[in-house]
């Protein structure tokens, strides 16, 4: 299974991401991955600007190679992106000039979509023609592969099918036997497989979510042009 992550029109394969992460973000010879994170850190938003501090914090985690923290925050960013897009879309260009108070200008919409789960809100994005059918399917895929398992402590299908090598030997014998084992029956193997998956794909997932954010922000600006 090959993952392809899209960031600002450029596709990053899993091989590229794995190679760069394994080389180490902090090494001087590895410039491209650092530039990608810096580029993400410098994301410019207008309508979805409240998301910028979260984007910056995730970038900080990536520089420190804190991948499990990265996935947790990216899942929160994903869900908040969807909710805020629905909030601003439904508000339809509302500003303080329309007679609303600063502290409750979007109160109705925040209460409405804040109570719904991610899957429901993605469906609403599609029904409102805010996203295409392809984008809908991709967001559902990201929800099932990243958000659900890493927010609920469950496993995605890739971790479920993961295997690892175990080596067996006996006292008095020079023979070492290699065994291929599944990971789901032992907590140490299972959690290590989860961490390995995120080390390999967490950056690509984050970059793709930021790409969606910038695209949605651009579309929302059409409603808030005044």
What is each PLM-predicted segment?
Residues 1-68:
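Charged alpha-helical initiation segments
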Residues 6-29, 44, 99, 103, ...:
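Intrinsic-disorder-associated interaction segments
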Residues 129-226:
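Charge-enriched, short contiguous segments at helix-coil
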Residues 115-133:
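...with weaker cross-activation on analogous glycine-rich loops/strands in unrelated enzymes
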Residues 18, 113-114, 141, 145:
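Intrinsically disordered, low-complexity sequence elements enriched in Ser/Thr/Gly/Pro
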């Amino acid at each position: 299974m090959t993952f392809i992550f899209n960031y600002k029109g450029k596709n990053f394969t899993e091989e590229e991401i794995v190679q760069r992460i394994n080389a180490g973000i902090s090494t001087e010879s590895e410039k491209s991955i650092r530039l990608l994170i810096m580029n993400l850190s410098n994301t410019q938003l207008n309508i979805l600007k409240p998301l910028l501090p979260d984007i910056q914090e995730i970038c900080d985690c990536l520089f420190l190679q804190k991948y499990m923290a990265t996935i947790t925050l990216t899942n929160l960013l994903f869900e908040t992106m969807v909710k805020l897009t629905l909030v601003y879309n439904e508000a339809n260009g509302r500003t303080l000039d329309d007679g609303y108070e600063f502290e409750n200008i979007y109160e109705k919409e925040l209460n409405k979509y804040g109570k719904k789960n991610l899957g429901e809100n993605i469906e609403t994005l599609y029904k409102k023609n805010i996203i295409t059918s392809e984008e809908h399917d991709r967001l559902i895929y990201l929800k099932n592969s990243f958000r659900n398992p890493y927010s609920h402590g469950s496993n995605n299908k890739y971790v479920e099918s993961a295997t690892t090598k175990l080596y067996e030997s006996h006292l008095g014998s020079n023979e070492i036997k290699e065994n291929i084992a599944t990971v789901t029956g032992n907590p140490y193997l299972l959690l290590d497989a989860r961490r390995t998956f995120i080390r390999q794909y967490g950056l690509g997932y984050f970059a793709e979510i930021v790409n969606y954010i910038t695209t949605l922000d651009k579309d929302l600006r059409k409603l808030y042009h005044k």
